[in-house]
């Protein structure tokens, strides 16, 4: 069954590939839209303390819906990640100075990373056949919350990390799977959700949508970590 990933993130591309299922990628900028979402989507959104427009599951739905509307692939997966600290949304930094400001706020503190997932399970409609309840897409929505604690960081350490360029395209201005992992002291919850795609939840949602033959998500997580040259964080044992 054909799977389309509605995301430009190379981290999500890589994580999904470790589940061993073939997929194609279609990218839109739909997550930035202000168009009202259907009532059935709004009422199905998981509870989240973020502002409505920033709700990661809503943004994931916008990505998946835009792709399905264009392509009507059998299964479309969308995801979006947002960082929150003290009630503030920390998205991707505008520039290096902004990244340094974000990391200064995060240093030595615990913040929450929210990753929303949307899966459309929609068989293509036959030519000339009107949409109906039988052909309407099945929709799955999910929100994963992980708590991340950064180590205390001095200005020189933050500046050196920002100079690598890694923080500039990442929510919260750090990449846990890259050099930014050295700044992390603890993860409570799904590690892969912090990267951008929680593998266990993704596996269950894709299975429900009819995708078969996937790698076990825990095995995929450990294989990915080994490929990265990493081990699970020991305190507490990090979940996939």
Features from the language model and the residues they span:
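N-terminal beta1-alpha1 ligand-phosphate binding loop
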Residues: 1-22
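Glycine-rich, phosphate-binding/catalytic loops in enzymes
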Residues: 21-24, 94-96
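A short beta-strand-loop structural module common to alpha/beta enzyme folds
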Residues: 22-36
């Amino acid at each position: 069954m054909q799977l389309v990933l509605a995301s430009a993130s190379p981290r999500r591309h890589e994580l999904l590939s470790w589940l061993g299922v073939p997929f194609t990628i279609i990218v839109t900028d739909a997550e930035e839209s202000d168009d009202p979402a259907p009532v059935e989507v709004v009422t199905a959104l998981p509870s989240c303390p973020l502002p409505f427009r920033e709700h990661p599951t809503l943004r994931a739905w916008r990505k998946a819906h835009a792709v399905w509307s264009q392509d009507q692939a059998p299964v479309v997966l969308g995801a979006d990640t947002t960082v929150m600290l003290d009630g503030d949304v920390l998205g991707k930094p505008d520039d290096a100075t902004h990244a340094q400001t974000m990391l200064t706020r995060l240093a030595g503190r615990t913040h929450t990373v929210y990753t929303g997932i949307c899966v459309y399970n929609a068989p293509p409609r036959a030519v000339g056949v009107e949409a109906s309840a039988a052909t309407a897409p099945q929709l799955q929505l999910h929100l994963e919350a992980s708590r991340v604690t950064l180590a205390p960081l001095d200005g020189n350490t933050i500046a050196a990390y920002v100079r690598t360029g890694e923080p500039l395209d990442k929510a919260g201005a750090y990449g846990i799977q890259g050099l930014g992992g050295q700044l992390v002291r603890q993860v409570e919850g799904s590690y892969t959700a912090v990267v951008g795609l929680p593998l266990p939840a993704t596996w269950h949602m894709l299975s429900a949508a009819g995708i078969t033959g996937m790698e076990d998500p825990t095995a995929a997580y450990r294989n990915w970590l080994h490929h990265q040259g990493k081990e699970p964080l020991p305190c507490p044992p990090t979940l996939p």
